[in-house]
């Protein structure tokens, strides 16, 4: 029976501990932050004889919210844009599709264990392999090696597109439609490799 009484006393002890916390004890914490907080804690202390502990906590929360609003307002006026630009600078920029595809190709060439097939990267490489700006000359031999292993419909489609592009360039050659010699050379290399 005595144990039950002690449990009952502990339960009330917890409640009384909550009630014992007064704003006066919290004053050192609040006074460290600034003058606005000091005035808020004095307001709570002045009202403490009249207010219950619950009402004091509610009042403290309201005052804390008001302080936060004022602080945000001051920051906005001071130029919060500076902090926003700092956040933007800390975020890493996403790599472009070109860099991702070229890294994919280099990973394949080095036979890295982390390399795995990615259809989107392969598609990008197949679409842009004739463009010297997007796939530099230094990466093109590696791309040709990659194309040797190309299988299935991707291989057939690449051959068809290369043949169609070659016919288009041959027909437009007398007019010189802008087919660069590098592009034509790349087309021939791809056709020789895959045909």
Curated annotation (Swiss-Prot):
Output compositional bias ranges, type Basic and acidic residues.
8-18, 26-39, 53-77
Per UniProt, which keywords does this protein have?
Phosphoprotein, Secreted
Q: In a knockout, what does one observe?
A: Intestine-specific knockout mice have elevated plasma cholesterol levels with increased cholesterol synthesis and VLDL secretion.
What does the record say about induction? Expression is induced by feeding and cholesterol absorption.
GO biological process: what's one of them?
negative regulation of cholesterol biosynthetic process
Kindly state the tissue distribution recorded for this protein.
Answer: Secreted via exosomes, secreted from the instestine, secretion is induced by feeding and cholesterol absorption. Expressed in enterocytes.
What InterPro entries has UniProt attached to this entry? WKF
Keyword Iron assigned to the entry: answer is no
Pfam families cross-referenced by the UniProt entry? WKF
State the source organism's domain of life: Eukaryota
Q: Which residues carry this modification: Phosphoserine?
A: 41, 48, 52, 96
Q: Where is this region: Disordered?
A: 1-78
GO molecular function terms here? hormone activity
One term under GO cellular component: extracellular space
The subcellular localization recorded is: Secreted
UniProt keyword annotation of Secreted present: yes
Q: List the disulfide bonds.
A: none
Function recorded in the entry: Hormone secreted from the intestine in response to cholesterol, where it acts to inhibit cholesterol synthesis in the liver and VLDL secretion,leading to a reduction in circulating cholesterol levels. Acts through binding to its receptor, GPR146.
Q: What is this protein called?
A: Cholesin
Source taxonomy: Eukaryota, Metazoa, Chordata, Craniata, Vertebrata
Gene that codes for this? Chlsn
């Amino acid at each position: 029976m005595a144990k039950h009484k002690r449990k009952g006393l502990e339960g009330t002890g917890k409640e009384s501990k909550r009630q014992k916390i007064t704003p006066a004890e919290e004053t050192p914490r609040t006074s460290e932050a600034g003058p606005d907080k000091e005035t808020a804690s004095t307001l709570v202390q002045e009202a403490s004889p009249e207010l219950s502990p619950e009402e004091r906590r509610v009042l403290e929360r309201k005052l804390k919210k008001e302080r936060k609003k004022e602080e945000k307002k001051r920051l906005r006026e001071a130029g919060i844009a500076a902090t926003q630009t700092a956040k933007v600078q800390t975020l890493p920029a996403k790599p472009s599709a070109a860099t991702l595809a070229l890294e994919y190709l280099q990973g394949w060439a080095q036979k890295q264990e982390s390399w795995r097939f990615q259809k989107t990267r392969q598609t990008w490489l197949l679409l842009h392999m004739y463009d010297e700006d997007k796939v530099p000359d230094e990466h093109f031999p590696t791309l040709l090696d990659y194309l040797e292993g190309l299988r299935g419909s991707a291989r057939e489609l690449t051959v068809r597109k290369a043949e169609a592009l070659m016919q288009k360039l041959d027909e437009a050659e007398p007019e010189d439609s802008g087919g660069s010699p590098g592009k034509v050379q790349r087309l021939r290399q791809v056709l020789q490799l895959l045909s």
